[in-house]
Every structure is written in C-alpha cells, then in structure tokens.
From Swiss-Prot:
Location in or out of the cell: Nucleus
Record keyword Nucleus present: yes
Biased composition (Basic and acidic residues): 171-181
Enzyme nomenclature, EC number: 2.5.1.25
Transmembrane residue ranges: none
Sequence motif: DXTW, positions: 199-202
Entry GO CC: nucleus
Role this protein plays: Catalyzes the formation of 3-(3-amino-3-carboxypropyl)uridine (acp3U) at position 20 in the D-loop of several cytoplasmic tRNAs (acp3U(20)).
Designated name of the protein: tRNA-uridine aminocarboxypropyltransferase 1
Main location (coarse class): nucleus
GO BP, one annotated term: tRNA modification
Keyword annotations of the record: Nucleus, S-adenosyl-L-methionine, Transferase, tRNA processing
Region annotated Disordered, chain positions: 158-181
C-alpha cells in the first residue's frame, strides 16, 4: 500500500498526539498519527485467532515466527513503510517472540529490516563509520550530536580521534563546540547507512551489547522520548523504549534533524499494530477498572 493511499485513509484510522503535553496516556496516544485504516485489524479481532499461511500456527493478526499476516488479515491491507536507512534487529534467544514488537518492523518495512537471533550477529567492523547502535547508557549520545560530529570529521578513516582506545568512539559535543559552529547545517548527512536495535528485556542485554562484534560502534540514545509500551519493565526509566517505538522515533528524528525535511507522517505506519494493540489493552484495563 502506498504512502499516499495511507494518508488518504488517515480519517478512518486511529491516531496519536504528542507525548509531551502532560495529558493522560490515552489522549496522548490516540491523536495525530497518520495511519492507514485499521478496519482490517478490527475485523480480524472479531474473528479471533487465525492460521499462519506458512506454518499453520494459530495466531492473532500476524505470525511472529514467520513474519507474515495470518489468513484473516489480507496482506494488501497492511501498509508498507519505506525507510531511509537499513535496520538490523538483534533479538535475544530467550526473548518471547509473541511479546516482542520487533516483528512489527519486519511486517511493515520488510525490505529494509533484517532480524537476527543472537548469537547470530553480522560483522560490522568494516562498516563502523556507517552504523550506529540505538542503546541507552552512560556513553550514549544524541543522534544530532553524533552526526554533527561526523560531519565535522572529514575523512573518517584518517581521523585518529575516531579510533578509540577502548574500542568505542569517544567524543564530547561540548568540547567540539567551536567545530560545530562551522558546520553547514543545510547539508544532509548521507553516510549513515544502517541502524542496529537490540530486542531484549533489559536484564538480558548486557552480554549482547558487550559482544565483540558490536564494539567500536557509537551508541545513540533517544533521550527525549517516553515509552507507552504496555509491557514496560519495572525499575527501568520511561525513556527505555520498546523496539518498534525506538525505530519509529529514530526515523522521525533522522528525517527532521539530519535529512532536514518536514515530517509528514512518512513513518507513522510503523506504529500500525502498536497503536491498535495499545488501544485494545487500554480498553480492557478500563473495563476491568484498572485505569
């Protein structure tokens, strides 16, 4: 389904609103997203579980093993999202497939998304100046700071400052402030080609993120975003996003801050399943008196 068609259907769809006005979660989350019609999901919900056309497993909406819609959800009614960057999702082997939102990305942007199950991890050493890992932590930086730094670095292969002694690039936007002031902010940054996302519960991530094959890559954190995932882990900050939320917000930030284009809902359909499931769960909680 084309983006133009999906925008024409936005009046029939669920929608979202900005997360930052302090309103209730439901009001925040059900306004303004330009989504394709979710009628197909509403019909499928009423029918109940259906077979996967590949493995014949009984599933609701989609098969999280085969990454395809179930028989009651016609593929033609599922939006297709084209991304400006390739995405690798590295999934922990103990992550419950049915609880992961990584499958949403593969279903909706299948040409640009590859899912690996750890310890199957590609080699990124020869691509380290073209790849970032979206992962929060003390050494993480914002997307804007990272790409501005690269813009000012010239020939990355010859830039000794970009060869870290501890295998991960170290830099400080504050220390490079004078350099930043000379950057042509109208010039798009085109050398970032791939983004890695870790799909795992937070207590399972340490071994994965420490894997030698992921060393030497800059960690980027989406510091201004808050999660609305219904399975958010207790004890973790609300800025720790679900996988599909992280992908969505990264793409929006890349589009507006790096490509410097007006955002017109190009990636909103990444939340096609997420938004619908959020609404179902919130409605159920309301009915049970838990909201």
């Amino acid at each position: 389904m084309s983006h133009e068609k999906s925008l024409q259907e936005k009046k029939d769809s669920s929608s979202f609103k900005s997360f930052h006005d302090g309103a209730s979660l439901e009001n925040d989350l059900l306004q303004n997203l330009q989504l394709s019609s979710q009628t197909v999901l509403e019909i499928a919900q009423k029918k109940g579980r259906s077979k996967c056309p590949k493995c014949n497993s009984s599933r609701m909406f989609y098969c999280y093993t085969c990454f395809v819609p179930v028989e009651s959800v016609p593929s033609d009614d599922i939006p297709v999202v084209k991304l400006p960057l390739k995405i690798d999702i590295i999934k922990h082997p103990n992550e419950t497939d049915g609880k992961s939102t990584a499958v949403h990305a593969k279903l909706l942007a299948h040409e640009d998304v590859t899912v690996y199950t750890y310890p199957c991890v590609p080699q990124y050493h020869d691509q380290k100046h073209e790849v970032v890992v979206v992962f929060p932590g003390p050494d993480s930086v914002s997307l804007s700071d990272y790409l501005l730094y690269l813009s000012s670095s010239g020939d990355l292969e010859k830039n000794s400052a970009y060869e870290p002694s501890s295998k991960r690039p170290k830099f400080s936007p504050e220390n490079d402030k004078n350099t930043y002031e000379g950057i042509d902010k109208k010039k798009p940054v085109n050398f970032l080609k791939k983004v890695i996302f870790i799909d795992s519960t937070w207590n399972q991530t340490n071994k994965m993120i420490a894997d030698e094959r992921l060393q030497g890559l800059v960690h980027v954190e989406l510091m201004e975003r808050k999660t609305f995932f219904w399975r958010h882990q207790k004890g973790t900050p609300n800025t720790y996003l679900s996988t599909i939320e992280a992908i969505y917000y990264f793409m929006v930030d890349y589009h507006t801050k790096i490509l410097q284009k007006d955002y017109k809902g190009e990636y909103d359909n990444l939340l096609f399943f997420f938004s619908f499931m959020y609404r179902i769960i919130n409605d159920a909680k309301k009915s049970a008196g838990k909201l």
